[in-house]
Amino acid sequence: MKTLSPVDAVLKKVRAFNAEHGMFRPGDRVVVAVSGGADSVALVDILVSLNELRLDLVVAHLNHKLRGAASDEDERFVEQCAQTYALPFVSRGEQVKALAEWERLSLEDAGRRARYAFFDDVAAACGARTVALAHHADDQAETLLMRLVRGAGGLGLSAMQPVGAGGKYVRPLLALGRQEIEAYLDARGLAFRQDQSNTDVAFLRNRIRHELVPYLGRLNPGAASRLARTAELLADDEALLSRLVEEALRRHVMVTEQGGAICSVDTLRREPRGLRRRLYRKAIALAKGDLARISFDHVDAIDRLVLSENPSGRLHLPEEILVTRSYNEVAFARRMADIPSLQELWIDGPGCWPLSGGGELVVEIATGPPPWGELSTTESWFDLELAPFPWLIRGWRPGDRMIPLGMTGEKKVKDIFIDQKVPRELRRSIPLLFRGDSLLWVCGCRRGESARITAGSRAMAVVRIRGRRLK
């Protein structure tokens, strides 16, 4: 069998990898992320060489402004590279160090954020469907090790995907190792830039690349490729688990109008811990928009809250995300200002009475007996001879009591709230209806014995509350 040249061997692998993962379609416009280093220079040349795809390439370079004149020389080199292939060139300068300080990020994380924002902008501006990145199999092994050292679950350890972000970001060189890329560059006679920061072992990735990976290579010469294969296997498992999580999400999680999520505690407790943790992360993402700054400790704290015998509790997560346990519900939402206490309102007769904080109280004179079997918790009837106007609407105060309908003894309103599972943060906003010192109705919870309708009642009022959350 004829041995393929380094160039032909690389092109054959990339073609097969593209066929397997569907990264490119003939005629696609593709933004190529080019730093000027060996891998990205090889990427441009490889994509140009895939003649059968007729790709419409745009070279994009972000100047990180971290290495002074050397950063500017990198930019000029990439521009000349684009000119060599007669490709459009787009660049932008970004003060990554200032961004890192402002956002309290590491230089690595700030640089990554700036690059992806830039690539997104370029793709949108030129109408590109795809952004091609130059990560290869050795990068994959390094990423897996880095995340393993920092601590990660299955999703993190599956590392980089050949096709990510819904098909937007593709990594055609994951099929290749560093040595194959270097042999390709040498065979093609391609020059590239050397970034001295890549040798700085102050960065974790560089320590892994220059110290840990060579050590593992001495233990097993194929360690890097096997680590990359492990990441691929984990990614396959993760795809299956993600499908199971999505199915559980539809069954167990209710998405709120405000963009948060509510889950049943009893339902969560019946699920395996691994699935619970994934559901928590999904619920946080619904409320927050992403999972940035969410750690294992946060997710573990939520699980303890769900499993606790205490029926209520709350957790404050980064970026104003609040997780609240209230009896059999756990809610994930962006924290809002505390709900204010209800302002006092005097009711002197029938009409629509707006309530502070939203909603209204509707008072009507009744002409017939109550439809006892059809009354909702937002409606109550009163004997006007026993409780004539004016009435007072106000919020709950510690010490408030009432005689509930059908009982002879008093009960604390706080205990009524607990029985009805009213969240603690809502209690001071629940309307209480008084006639003098007598509490007639804890709206949405319990009616009082005072002024109840009897067979002998002649003058009656029906009161309804509308447009207000009561539980």
From Swiss-Prot:
One of its GO terms (molecular function) is ATP binding. The keyword Ion transport does not apply. It is found in: Cytoplasm. Keywords: ATP-binding, Cytoplasm, Ligase, Nucleotide-binding, tRNA processing. It is an enzyme of class 6 (ligase). ATP binds at residues 35-40. The N-terminal region contains the highly conserved SGGXDS motif, predicted to be a P-loop motif involved in ATP binding. NCBIfam families: lysidine_TilS_C (TIGR02433), lysidine_TilS_N (TIGR02432). This is tRNA(Ile)-lysidine synthase.
